[in-house]
């Protein structure tokens, strides 16, 4: 019986599973899946033939991990905590950090089951179980990477950014930020929204599945996906009756990778009225 099949079968009877009743095979399978997510061997979502595919069985393994463990004491630098999920770096020493090749600034917190790639920097931030933060990415101060979220290469998550998770409330697919994106301070990308490669999200932009994404060049309104190379700011659209306006995200321009590499982020955002 494959690892996936064991997880799928266990999930169907998840209401019956507790730390005391879980059988050895199921526990071993769940722990192997979490270890695979932690090491980067597995990922909850990946791009296959140009389309994002969610491996639902791995998401189910994350959910099941909460069923098989009791709360226990988690040691912190200044205090103690009490939780079902251990911290990723609990057993790390200097040699292990050097081997992994990333920087972690206190009091950044990363749960076991999240993958952190080389050349990333974690300022005082939070990365939840099942998430993946790829190479060269900066997770800035007080940014949050939610459960199972996928953060690409060379991404900058600015201060206070929130990237939504899949566990609370339960979502079908993870939130995805593709390679070479910039997410401005205090912005929120949630509910499985995909921000495609090379996009720039300005400060204070909120995008969920029900958020209208208005392209001012075409007049088109879309939902749930920011096209590659978009520069996005917060805005509003008038109601049909014309008596009020409702929030939306506005694509003010498109840039290619060459332009993005030559022009600073601030310059792109300063010239949105051109």
From Swiss-Prot:
It is an enzyme of class 2 (transferase). Keywords: Acyltransferase, Amino-acid biosynthesis, Cytoplasm, Diaminopimelate biosynthesis, Lysine biosynthesis, Repeat, Transferase. GO terms for cellular component: cytoplasm. Pfam families: Hexapep_2, THDPS_N_2. Its EC number is 2.3.1.117. One of its GO terms (biological process) is lysine biosynthetic process via diaminopimelate. This is 2,3,4,5-tetrahydropyridine-2,6-dicarboxylate N-succinyltransferase. The lineage of its organism: Bacteria, Pseudomonadati, Pseudomonadota, Gammaproteobacteria, Pasteurellales. The gene is dapD.
């Amino acid at each position: 019986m494959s690892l996936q099949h064991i997880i799928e079968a266990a999930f169907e009877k998840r209401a019956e599973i507790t730390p005391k009743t879980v059988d050895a095979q199921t526990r071993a399978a769940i722990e192997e899946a979490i270890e695979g997510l932690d090491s980067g061997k597995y990922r909850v979502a990946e791009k296959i033939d140009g389309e994002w595919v969610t491996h639902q069985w791995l998401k189910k393994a994350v959910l099941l991990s909460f069923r098989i463990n009791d709360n226990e004491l988690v040691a912190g630098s200044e205090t103690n905590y009490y939780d079902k999920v251990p911290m990723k770096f609990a057993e790390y020493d200097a040699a292990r950090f050097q081997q992994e090749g990333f920087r972690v600034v206190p009091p950044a917190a990363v749960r076991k089951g999240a993958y952190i790639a080389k050349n990333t920097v974690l300022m005082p931030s939070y990365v939840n179980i099942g998430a993946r933060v790829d190479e060269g990415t900066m997770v800035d101060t007080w940014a949050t990477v939610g459960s199972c979220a996928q953060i690409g290469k060379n991404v900058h998550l600015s201060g206070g950014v929130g990237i939504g998770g899949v566990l609370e409330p339960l979502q079908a697919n993870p939130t995805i930020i593709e390679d070479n994106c910039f997410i401005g301070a205090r912005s929120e990308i949630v509910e499985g929204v995909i921000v495609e490669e090379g996009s720039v999200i300005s400060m204070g932009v909120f995008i969920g599945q029900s958020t209208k994404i208005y392209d001012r060049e075409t007049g088109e309104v879309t939902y749930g996906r920011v096209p590659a190379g978009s520069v996005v700011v917060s805005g509003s659209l008038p109601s049909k009756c014309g008596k009020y306006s409702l929030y939306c995200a506005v694509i003010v321009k498109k840039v290619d990778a060459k332009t993005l590499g030559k022009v600073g982020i601030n310059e792109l955002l300063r010239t949105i009225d051109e």
